[in-house]
């Protein structure tokens, strides 16, 4: 296996576009899989993604676009998957080329629905990719700030630390700092949880709770995250590292956070469906909430914030009532 070898971006959204920008700062060229031919043609004509991060310009001659996932996989050594988790299986259904000899990087911040597996486990169990050939990318890092080249930090998780370091060097640049970690599962679960807590923060904002309460909410959220991670994947970790606490903070507080925006709309009285229609973007935390709730039926971790968000989104309990109950459980 060449590492990183020829890199492919698998997805066409804002995070995929940001990662392509980061990779192309070091790589001479990339392969780029996008599902829609019309989007590819527009990209080539305009010199930028026509739908996401439109301010980011690309030198098109350095990008080999294709809507054929098998062609892209065959011609690449490292595959960076950057699609919303609910759509991953539909993309992979078209895949006839084996990927177990590729280096798989997941920048997907979610759990595969129906399977209730984090993405690294899904690639390992379903596609036979060795665990040491799977890496994850974690923040704190908003795509919009990558577009602006604001200083950002990425953590690369891989059970093979040497491979993590090689790939991390491929991403490092003047505005991207990188670190590595062997805690693949912990980083992935933390990425799912941060979206749920960002929705909670948004709901509270929509209900006009102030900064004082938001601080208490996030303090309790990091404790809840720590309890869950220590139960589902008990390894030594520092929960205050940027891949855990840092990513949680930026996702919960930033105006770029679509999950916080989604939560704010729910807090203001929008239904789930109307909020999703108005946003026109995927709020991963909506799907992640149900997945974590299902997982926790077997783990029995005390997770009052996740429970509250689930009750609001799926049981249609009034946000005002549910958050009031939550406030009574905090200290």
Language model segments and positions:
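A short helix-to-beta-strand connector/capping loop
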Residues: 56-65, 129-133, 174-176, 301
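NAD(P)+-binding Rossmann beta1-loop-alpha1 motif at the extreme N-terminus of oxidoreductases
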Residues: 1-56, 63-67
């Amino acid at each position: 296996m060449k590492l990183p070898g020829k890199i492919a971006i698998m997805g066409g959204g804002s995070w995929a576009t940001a990662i392509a920008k980061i990779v192309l700062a070091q790589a001479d060229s990339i392969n780029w899989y996008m599902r829609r031919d019309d989007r590819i043609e527009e990209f080539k004509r305009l010199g930028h993604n026509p739908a996401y991060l439109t301010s980011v310009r690309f030198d098109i001659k350095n990008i080999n676009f294709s809507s054929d996932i098998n062609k892209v996989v065959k011609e690449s050594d490292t595959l960076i998957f950057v699609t919303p988790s609910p759509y991953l299986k539909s993309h992979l259904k078209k895949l006839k080329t084996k990927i177990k000899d590729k280096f798989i990087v997941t920048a997907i911040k979610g759990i595969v629905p129906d399977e209730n597996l984090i993405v690294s486990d899904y690639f390992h169990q379903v596609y036979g990719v060795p665990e040491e050939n799977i890496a994850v990318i974690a923040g704190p890092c908003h795509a919009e700030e990558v577009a602006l080249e604001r200083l950002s930090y990425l953590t690369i998780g891989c059970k093979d630390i040497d491979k993590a370091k090689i790939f991390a060097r491929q991403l490092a640049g003047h505005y991207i700092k990188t670190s590595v970690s062997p805690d693949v599962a912990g980083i992935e679960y933390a990425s799912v949880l941060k979206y749920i807590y960002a929705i909670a923060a948004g709901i509270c904002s929509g209900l006009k709770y102030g900064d004082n309460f938001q601080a208490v909410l996030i303090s309790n959220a990091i404790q809840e995250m720590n309890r869950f991670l220590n139960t589902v994947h008990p390894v030594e970790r520092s929960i205050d590292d940027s891949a855990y606490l840092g990513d949680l903070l930026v996702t919960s507080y930033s105006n770029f956070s679509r999950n916080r925006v989604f939560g704010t709309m729910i807090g203001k009285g929008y239904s789930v469906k109307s909020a999703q229609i108005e946003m026109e973007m995927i709020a991963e935390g909506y799907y992640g909430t149900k997945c974590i709730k299902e997982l926790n039926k077997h783990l029995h971790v005390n997770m009052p914030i996740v429970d509250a968000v689930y009750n609001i989104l799926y049981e249609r309990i009034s946000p005002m009532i549910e958050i009031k109950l939550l406030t009574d459980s905090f200290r």
